Curated annotation (Swiss-Prot):
Keyword Signal set for record: yes
Family: Belongs to the Poa p IX/Phl p VI allergen family.
Taxonomic placement: Eukaryota, Viridiplantae, Streptophyta, Embryophyta, Tracheophyta
Superkingdom in the source lineage: Eukaryota
Cited SUPFAM superfamilies: Group V grass pollen allergen
Name of the molecule in the record: Pollen allergen KBG 60
Pfam families, per database record: Pollen_allerg_2
Tissue spec. comment: Pollen.
Segment forming the signal sequence: 1-22
Keyword line: Allergen, Signal
InterPro entries per the UniProt record, alphabetical: Poa_pIX/Phl_pVI, Pollen_allergen/Os
Organism: Poa pratensis
């Protein structure tokens, strides 16, 4: 199952580079008959203060998706355990459909804006499909947890590239300061966002090289030069190797999309593993020890790719 979930992430390139599709088309398979069990740790968080004001069409769309996500979590929290998954999917599906419709119906402002909007819709659609796949085959007790956790992390990464308040799991939102064991993954997550932003501004054929260089530079800067690239984290290095294998003889733009998807999946896996793991005996342990605990937990749980 772990290998199947990781394979799904690698092949999301077909969804990301293809035409954007409404989430309504996915609801037919997004609400399976098996009822969900209670989800732990997803009670809605109280407002954490003013978020950055959305200015671009893309930012406004992400903000609406963010609001819809939190409304769906709140709705799921108020129904019996057996209805949580179905309620979340229905509520979030309606909100995201509305956001898509409003974004696509705005007055055209040029080919560049239309292209940017279409790219965002495609990435959002891919995030929804990834979340559904992550919950596919899960036990009733885990289905809601898996779906919401995967979707929230995917949306957070997408939102990060737009420099706007992103969706975060409620358990993370209620914390004023990240726990010590999350700080290393926070740096990796931040490096990913920097690299994705740089790649988005580069020509299609240069996105892959720009992303990889920016990602390594950001990691080096955030660790004070202690690490030169992503290779100090085994799970990331393994993800990169697999993404390279999947991009042989493909166009540069496609290669970048597969590479980005693979890293996104690996970072999400490590983040979830660290959140689930118990705090280390020494909260001031080294970065290497923290990363080792995270990757070890992920591997033990599901081959290193459980989300």
């Amino acid at each position: 199952m772990a290998v199947q979930k990781y394979t799904v992430a690698l092949f999301l390139v077909a969804l990301v580079v293809g035409p954007a599709a409404s989430y309504a088309a996915d609801l037919s398979y997004g609400a399976p008959a098996t009822p969900a069990a209670p989800a732990a740790g997803y009670t809605p968080a109280a407002p954490a203060g003013a978020a950055p004001k959305a200015t671009t069409d893309e930012q406004k769309m992400i903000e609406k998706i963010n609001v819809g996500f939190k409304a769906a979590v709140a709705a799921a929290g108020g129904v019996p355990a057996a209805n949580k998954y179905k309620t979340f999917v229905a509520t979030f599906g309606a909100a995201s459909n509305k956001a898509f419709a409003e974004a696509l119906s705005t007055e055209p402002k040029g080919a560049a804006v239309d292209s940017s909007k279409a790219a965002l819709t495609s990435k959002l659609d891919a995030a929804y499909k990834l979340a559904y796949k992550s919950a596919e085959g899960a036990t009733p007790e885990a289905k809601y947890d898996d779906y919401v956790a995967t979707l929230s992390e995917a949306l957070r990464i997408i939102a990060g590239t737009l420099e706007v308040h992103g969706v975060k799991p409620a358990a993370e939102e209620v914390k004023a300061t990240p726990a010590g064991e999350l700080q290393v993954i926070d740096k990796v997550d931040a490096a990913f966002k920097v690299a994705a932003t740089a790649a988005n501004a580069a020509p299609a054929n240069d996105k892959f090289t720009v992303f990889e260089a920016a990602f390594n530079d950001a990691i080096k800067a955030s660790t004070g030069g202690a690490y030169q690239s992503y290779k100090f984290i085994p799970a990331l290095e393994a993800a990169v190797k697999q993404s390279y294998a999947a991009t042989v003889a493909t166009a540069p733009a496609v290669k970048y999309t597969v590479f980005e998807t693979a890293l996104k999946k690996a970072i999400t896996a490590m983040s979830q593993a660290q959140k689930a793991a118990k705090p280390a005996a020494a909260a001031t342990g080294t970065a290497t020890a923290a990363v080792g605990a995270a990757t070890g937990a992920a591997t033990a749980a599901a081959g290193g790719y459980k989300v």
